[in-house]
């Protein structure tokens, strides 16, 4: 599926990027251990290795690196977005950054890493989820938000933002050296 998305994006001249939540999989799906679900099936690798909430064993960190390196090697994304917790594993995340940035030199094209917490904004593009900044930033930054006022996906009865609200946010964000990643949920 990723390969097909990359091919379609490139056909249209769109820069191809990926989002990875692999690190959060270590604890995010643990609730599925409390009732019968596919999270309990150890033959399914979708969920990665498990750990207690926000405790990252070496196995979990190595799994994160292997999975992320595989995505880089197979698909050469020009952008990788991380939600939440990469700041909790600085040694491993620094290895990822070095690998990805060195790959970009081999490819002869620039790359971008988006993350939320704990890294200087001259190393990667900081992300503010569903928020804005009070003033302009020297380095580029991003906010990610959804057209839904409360959800990222389908919720019965969800109220969407108006076009005027979205345009107002976009103008404010861009005027402060930011960009808007807009989720259009189902």
Q: Where do the protein language model's features map onto the residues?
A:
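Mature catalytic domains of secreted/periplasmic carbohydrate-active enzymes
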Residues: 1-186
């Amino acid at each position: 599926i990723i390969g097909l998305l990359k091919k379609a994006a490139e056909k249209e001249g769109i820069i191809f990027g990926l989002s990875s939540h692999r690190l959060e999989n270590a604890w995010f799906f643990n609730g599925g251990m409390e009732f019968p679900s596919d999270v309990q099936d150890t033959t399914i690798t979708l969920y990665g290795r498990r750990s207690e909430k926000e405790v990252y064993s070496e196995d979990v960190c190595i799994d994160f690196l292997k999975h992320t390196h595989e995505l880089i090697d197979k698909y050469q994304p020009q952008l990788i977005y991380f939600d939440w917790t990469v700041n909790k594993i600085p040694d491993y995340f620094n290895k990822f950054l070095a690998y990805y940035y060195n790959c970009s030199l081999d490819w002869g094209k620039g790359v971008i890493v988006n993350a939320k917490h704990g890294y200087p904004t001259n190393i990667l593009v900081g992300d503010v989820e569903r928020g804005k900044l009070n003033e302009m930033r020297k380095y580029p930054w991003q906010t990610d938000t959804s057209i839904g006022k409360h959800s990222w996906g389908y919720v019965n009865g969800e109220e969407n933002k108006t076009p005027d609200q979205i345009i107002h946010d976009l103008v404010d964000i861009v005027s402060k050296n930011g960009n808007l990643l807009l989720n259009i949920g189902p």
